[in-house]
Amino acid sequence: MLDTSQEIMKGTTTVGLIFDGGVVLATEMRATMGNMIASKRAKKIYQITPRIGLTTAGGVGDAQQLVRILQVECNLFEMRRGKTMSVGAASTLLSNYLNQNRYYPYYVQLLMGGFDDEGPSVYSVDAMGGATKEEDIVATGSGSPFAYGVLEDQYRAGMKEDDAKDLAVRAVRSAMRRDSASGEDIMVVVITKDKYEEHIESGLQRPSAARPTL
């Protein structure tokens, strides 16, 4: 019997990093089914609250259901408490839900980033419900080893917003060069105290200088 879980878990590249005043989340937009490109415009970053975003890697249906559950629970929390849920509380809620279903797991790997009273933060959450608060940078998916190479080398604490966005895009592009499951354009989300901003960057490389022929 073919075990497809490992294949499902790998096909993407998502990146999260903290800058001075906020968080940047970035993903490429290719969706794959085995060796086939199923979509070139796949959405992999979802807004959970006005200050929280979630990146998804893994099974599309599983990820979308979890997004809907989180959105509803966060809305109910705000209606009952009169305030928005913190990033840490939302990651704990997600972690608990995944752990309760560990024997029938959701095939996902998730990054949650946002801004609350404690400032910007990023959490990684696995299919078994394990949640980790990351210090500054994180990447998931099949392209993550390539993205980490760029992030580890070029990330600096206290980066400004524009520099952080540029680094996130370069990290995803680096993964796209070597990971066949990552490709197309790049979705970038910036979350600060005052905004949730989403835009698309080209996945294509800038033209390089002509190389001499042999």
From Swiss-Prot:
It comes from the Archaea. GO terms for cellular component: cytoplasm; proteasome core complex, beta-subunit complex. It is found in: Cytoplasm. GO terms for molecular function: threonine-type endopeptidase activity. Disulfide bonds: none annotated. InterPro entries: Ntn_hydrolases_N (IPR029055), Pept_T1A_Psome_bsu_arc (IPR019983), Pept_T1A_subB (IPR000243), Proteasome_bsu_CS (IPR016050), Proteasome_sua/b (IPR001353), Proteasome_suB-type (IPR023333). Component of the proteasome core, a large protease complex with broad specificity involved in protein degradation. It catalyses: Cleavage of peptide bonds with very broad specificity. Keywords: Autocatalytic cleavage, Cytoplasm, Hydrolase, Protease, Proteasome, Threonine protease, Zymogen. Its main location: cytoplasm. The formation of the proteasomal ATPase PAN-20S proteasome complex, via the docking of the C-termini of PAN into the intersubunit pockets in the alpha-rings, triggers opening of the gate for substrate entry. Interconversion between the open-gate and close-gate conformations leads to a dynamic regulation of the 20S proteasome proteolysis activity. Its EC number is 3.4.25.1. The active site is at T12 (nucleophile). The 20S proteasome core is composed of 14 alpha and 14 beta subunits that assemble into four stacked heptameric rings, resulting in a barrel-shaped structure. The two inner rings, each composed of seven catalytic beta subunits, are sandwiched by two outer rings, each composed of seven alpha subunits. The catalytic chamber with the active sites is on the inside of the barrel. Has a gated structure, the ends of the cylinder being occluded by the N-termini of the alpha-subunits. Is capped at one or both ends by the proteasome regulatory ATPase, PAN. Belongs to the peptidase T1B family. GO terms for biological process: proteasomal protein catabolic process. This is Proteasome subunit beta. Residues 1-11 form a propeptide.
